[in-house]
């Protein structure tokens, strides 16, 4: 089981796994935890280290506010650029054999620091890394946005989505109709 959450030391995931008795790897990738878990699980299976693997992530709005921004009790006014972290969880079971969607490739991103220091504008802060990851994926695989039904980023929101779209437009790559962000859905 590869699992993570938005709390220190992945405490939510660790508590969930404590009585399960399955091998557990705690991951802390913040917004990238699910993509990280899925890609690592696929690599473990492809490398012959596992027949099946579970990829899990969870988050809680109030915990994320406390961890990354301001506790709700603080009473701060949310600026229009602030993200709304979901309270929820998701899990995928990956297997070496069977029917269903397949992980055929993964592109791991790099850290891109655009100098954004406003914790209420994470979309603008994360957008350059999302752009670089997608750009690297297209270059490494020889694919284009036309090869995909939908390209989805995790939580860039309105501003981050606009930044990614503009960066690709500057490259002459049109994403319209192919790109969305979970923060807009």
Predicted region positions:
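Short acidic, glycine/proline-enriched helix-loop-strand junctions
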Residues: 21-24, 66-77
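Short alpha-helical "patches" and their helix-cap loops
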Residues: 53-58, 105-107
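Condensing-enzyme catalytic core mediating Claisen C-C bond formation in acyl metabolism
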Residues: 71-135, 140, 177-185
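Claisen-condensing/thiolase-fold acyl-transfer catalytic domains that form or cleave C-C bonds
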Residues: 4-8, 13-52, 59, 64, ...
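N-terminal glycine/serine-rich phosphate-binding loop of ATP-dependent small-molecule kinases
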Residues: 1
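Short helix-terminating capping/connector loops at secondary-structure junctions
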Residues: 141-146
